[in-house]
Each structure stands twice: as C-alpha cells, then as structure tokens.
Amino acid sequence: MLNTNVFCRPFDDLSDPLVKKEAIFAGKILEIAENKEIEILTSDILYGELSLISDQRKRDIIFNEIENVSQRKIKISDEVHNLAADLTGLVGDYSDSLHISFAAISNCDCLITCDRHLIKIKYKIESFLISKGLELAILTPEEFAESFD
C-alpha cells in the first residue's frame, strides 16, 4: 500500500534533493505496479486525502494514476477504526494511523511512505503491530524500489 505522499511526490518541490530522490523512486514503484509486478491496494483514506488537493489538474492526474495501478480498494471497517484509534497515541496523527491500519488489516506486506515522522518511528509502529498479531513493514520508496534492482 502506498501512502498518499508517494503518489503526490512527483508533483512536490523537486528543488529539495531528498524530495527529488523520493520522486524518482516513487516513479519506479509506479512503473513496477503498472507492469503488474506488485499488487497495489488503495483505501478510503487515500481517496479522502486525494480530495483535499486543491489543484484540480494535479488531483485528476494523481487520481488517474491511482486508478491505473490499484488492484483493490479497501473499505473502512470497525477493525480499521479501532486499530487506528490505538495507533494514534504512538503515531500522533489519525490519518497516518488510518493508512497504517488499512495496510495492516488488509495483510499488505508494507506501507510505503515519504513521511519522515513515520520512517523515524517505524520500528515502534512495527513492534506495536506485532503485539496486536499483525505484521507490516514501513518502508521508504527507496527501500522498496531497491528490492527490485
């Protein structure tokens, strides 16, 4: 599962070297997905965040890319809500907790994100999920894309 920021990264300020690098790897992941080498799941939170993009053209381009690579859309459930509520104290942001919960509950291998805070606390998140009987790796676009080289 891809966090919203991975889909958006190619449209961000690429003058920042880290953002540019993330955009390149995000593009590689989307290419891998378009070639059907991986399965991309989407979620209600992804589409909810997408609706917040004020630039209509950017939103339409990202929406089309999501629709192009998505294999299946995961709907919100009580299980997702409950896990997100439990995670929010650790993560600090309910939307991020929802992304993690959707990915974990739907048995994704990983959540790919450019969110520096989530990357910083990824081992805490992964340990918390293990304590709940769930497994999910939190990866940067680079970490994921390099596993295909």
Regions found by a protein language model. Give the residues of each.
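Short, well-structured N-terminal submotif of metal-dependent ribonuclease cores
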Residues: 1-42, 52-60, 125-128
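Short, solvent-exposed polar/charged micro-motifs at secondary-structure junctions
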Residues: 49-53, 82-86, 147-149
